[in-house]
Amino acid sequence: MKIDPRAFSKDGFLKDQDYLSNFPYGRYPTSFNGCGWVAIYNAEHAAGHGIAVEAVYEAMRRILPYEGTHGTPFPTMVRYFKEKHIPIARIYGSGEELVRIVRESAAPRGILRYIEGREPHYIAFVRVSDETPARYRFFNAADGKEDFVETMEYFRREHLGGRRVVRLLLPGEEREDARARGKNHIVDAKWSEHLPRRCVQYPVLRRKNSFEPLSGIGRGA
């Protein structure tokens, strides 16, 4: 399938899922429910893995449950990285907690799952500066915020408000020699020491008498 060039940033990130309506994702077009696989592609692209958009799309479409009617469930996002033998830290908590974790670990990139307006949504972010506070580049966040640079605290304030649970994925990298041995290692020296296990799970904060969808649908308002 041909990709509308308007979906891309100049350096090859997918910045706007609205231009991917010709990519069916379960029952719906990617423009409606494909934020999950778009975020994974951006994280892969940021890591320099050289993977094609179509390869990520096909891999995610193959493991997508419920015909995409629930968007991309969080466990499906994790499954993608596990099947690719990429170590992944999986973290749950409030917006404040996750901002702190990203800051303290100096994570170079990651994926956030949160509520944009009333819709569950995934975005990828990439660290672009080491100044204090660090600045990050965010992709496919909302209309008018398809590709922008800001602090994580700004993003929390504007997009992670309330007491809803936020989910964070911090994918690592593989060494070529480790892959040959069938083993995987997180090799980003700046932050690997903060992620001692392949899966880090923090206590889940839940609101009483409330329901939060577990998927990612749409790109927000």
Which residues does each PLM region occupy?
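Intrinsic-disorder/low-complexity regions
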Residues: 3, 10, 15-17, 21, ...
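Active-site-adjacent structural segments surrounding the nucleophilic cysteine of cysteine proteases
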Residues: 1-67, 192, 206-207, 218
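Ala/Thr-enriched low-complexity intrinsically disordered regions
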Residues: 178-180, 189, 221
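Conserved active-site-adjacent core of cysteine acyl-enzyme catalytic domains
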Residues: 55-174, 185-188, 198, 209-210
